[in-house]
Regions:
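Short, well-formed alpha-helical segments that are part of the catalytic scaffolds
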Residues: 14-28
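Acidic helix N-cap motif at the loop->helix transition within catalytic regions
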Residues: 18-20, 45-54, 60, 95, ...
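A conserved acidic beta->alpha catalytic loop
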Residues: 25, 32, 40-50, 67
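Glycine-rich, basic loop-to-helix element that forms the pyrophosphate-binding segment
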Residues: 66-82, 103
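Donor-binding/catalytic cores of nucleotide-activated saccharide
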Residues: 71, 92-194, 201-217
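Short aromatic/hydrophobic "clamp" motif used to bind/position activated sugar donors
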Residues: 87
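Catalytic core of nucleotide-sugar-dependent glycosyltransferases
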Residues: 199-206, 212-240, 251-283
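Membrane-interface aromatic/basic loop that binds lipid-linked glycans or pyrophosphate carriers
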Residues: 261-319
Length: 319
């Protein structure tokens, strides 16, 4: 059997409502030499049976069923089974835009890049706005990731040469930001990365999705991932240490914003620790948004606890 050119990996957990549209968005692509790996991660809503039905209707759709192990394990299962020269990741509640595969494949071939990425859209709102096609070489991709370039947030919305993935896998012990860390590890291999000025991915906001879940201690992975990135930069890219410190500082700031929304005193010691870290590292802050500047001011001028108190009052009043 001839190997497909592109392998599309879709982790699916209780996504029965969204899978038909997701699969149809792949089937509607201009480029038709693909395989679609549906990884049923122990679904309990009938998603597994639907994967089998979709496979029976289209031989390019390949279902795989496993016990629930999380999105990273599901994506890794897809990587182990893909046969394509190129790989894409697509979430089960999202869709590829028309022409996605053709645009990304053309960009890779025209530039000799290893990773191609494009814009995403949520309803009528378009994210990720490169003004025109751009190419990163060497450390530029690592620098872009540390600087929060919007095309480095996620594993989806991209086409990868299978060779650049190699033996890199999603970390199963990371539950938040696992896909940005996966992409960061690929960028540390210093591949050529091309960004295209085209909307190629539709991101759908699902209230029960992993990225929309209520606060839990898995969010501690936000600064854990930042620490992992910092260690890699310290070891392999010392010239980017300033950018890495700024990245880590922003992760601490982000974590404090999440903690401010948590009632009670359960995380008070962690809040104190992070406030000390932010104050000590504020000299490395690189201004990016007015909102970020204001939040840093709050955190470094003794205003965090008044902000927290006011937030909790407003939250209770709104119930």
């Amino acid at each position: 059997m001839e190997a497909p050119l592109i392998s599309v990996i879709v982790p699916a957990y209780n996504a029965k409502k969204y899978l038909p549209a997701c699969v149809a968005s792949v089937q509607r692509q201009e480029h038709q030499n693909w395989e679609l790996l549906l990884i049923d991660d122990g679904s309990t809503d009938g998603s597994g049976a639907l994967c089998d039905e979709l496979a029976a209707a289209d031989g390019r759709v390949k279902p795989h069923h496993q016990q629930n192990a999380g999105v990273s394990a599901a994506r890794n299962a897809g990587i182990e089974r893909d046969r394509g020269e190129y790989v894409m990741f697509l979430d089960a509640d999202d869709e590829l835009m028309p022409g996605c595969m053709t645009s990304l494949l053309d960009a890779l071939r025209q530039t000799g890049a290893d990773i191609a990425a494009g814009k995403s859209t949520q309803d009528s709102f378009a994210w990720n706005h490169p003004q025109s096609r751009f190419v990163w070489n060497g450390e530029e991709g690592v620098s872009g990731s540390l600087g929060d370039h919007p095309l480095t947030y996620s594993a989806w919305g991209k086409l990868y040469r299978r060779a650049v993935i190699g033996d890199t896998r999603f970390r199963r012990d990371i539950r938040i930001n696992e896909d940005s860390f996966f992409l960061f590890c690929l960028l540390c291999k210093q591949p050529r990365f091309v960004g295209v000025d085209q909307v190629i991915y539709r991101y759908n906001v699902v209230p029960t999705g992993a990225s929309r879940a209520a606060f839990s201690e898995k969010y501690f992975d936000i600064f854990r991932v930042a620490d992992l990135k910092y260690e890699i930069i310290q070891r392999d890219f010392p010239a980017l240490l300033g950018a890495a410190q700024n990245m880590r500082l922003k992760a601490w700031m982000n974590m404090l914003e999440l903690l401010a929304a948590c009632p009670g005193r359960k995380y008070r010691d962690l809040e104190k620790e992070l406030l000390c870290k932010v104050r000590a590292a504020r000299g490395s802050y690189v201004s990016a948004t007015r909102r970020g500047d204001l939040w840093l001011f709050v955190l470094t001028h003794g205003l965090y606890y008044p902000y927290r108190f006011a937030y909790q009052l407003i939250k209770r009043a709104g119930k």
